[in-house]
């Protein structure tokens, strides 16, 4: 089945509030170019205000990504789970994975509730994804969780900005 969830390509802005943050914005721009993100550009204060009149007066620049878009994460996850279920995926909730090993024609997964063999494993462990990665890869990684805030507004308040707006990380 086809995944059925709404997607809106509205572009995104990473906003810089202080001139001394410009090197961070420029580094983010360069990383985006290296990663092949099309159409990236840095907007000055005037260009940003023209694009988003309600943006903070403190905003001095922004990285604009016209290909950015938004989905409802709840609807997306439900659509993916329904699609996976329709394609025969088995779900094992409240089950801790203790070991993951490659075997002939797939993987052996040892868990708190038994051992399973499968052809494919999807690592969807969020901030714990590094633990699964490190079970099977010689190149070890570490995920450092970050906190952020998303503001969910009433639909009647949804016209204050037209792009997805992020603060410059750091």
Predicted segments, located by residue:
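Short aromatic/hydrophobic contact patches that present stacked aromatics
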Residues: 12-16, 62-64, 150
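General beta-strand structural signal in soluble alpha/beta enzymes
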Residues: 41-44, 92-93, 123
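Flavin-dependent oxidoreductases
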Residues: 100-170
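Helical element adjacent to the flavin cofactor pocket in flavoenzyme catalytic cores
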Residues: 63-120
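Dinucleotide-binding Rossmann-like beta1-alpha1 core, especially the glycine-rich loop
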Residues: 1-51
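A short, glycine/Asx- and small/polar-enriched loop/turn
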Residues: 20, 51-60, 101-108
């Amino acid at each position: 089945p086809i995944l059925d969830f709404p997607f809106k390509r509205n572009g995104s802005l990473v906003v810089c509030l202080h001139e001394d943050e410009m090197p961070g914005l420029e580094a983010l721009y360069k990383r985006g170019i290296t990663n092949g993100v099309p159409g990236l550009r840095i907007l000055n204060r005037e260009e940003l205000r023209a694009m988003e009149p309600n943006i903070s007066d403190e905003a001095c620049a922004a990285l604009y990504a016209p290909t950015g878009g938004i989905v409802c994460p709840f609807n997306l996850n439900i659509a993916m789970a329904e699609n996976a279920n329709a394609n025969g995926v088995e779900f094992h909730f409240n089950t801790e994975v203790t070991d993951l090993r490659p075997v002939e024609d797939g993987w052996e997964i040892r868990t708190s509730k038994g051992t399973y063999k499968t052809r494919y494993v999807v690592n969807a462990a969020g901030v714990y994804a590094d633990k699964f990665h490190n079970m099977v890869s010689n190149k070890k990684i570490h995920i450092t969780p970050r906190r952020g805030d998303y503001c969910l507004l009433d639909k009647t308040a949804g016209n204050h900005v037209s792009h997805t707006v992020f603060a410059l990380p750091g």
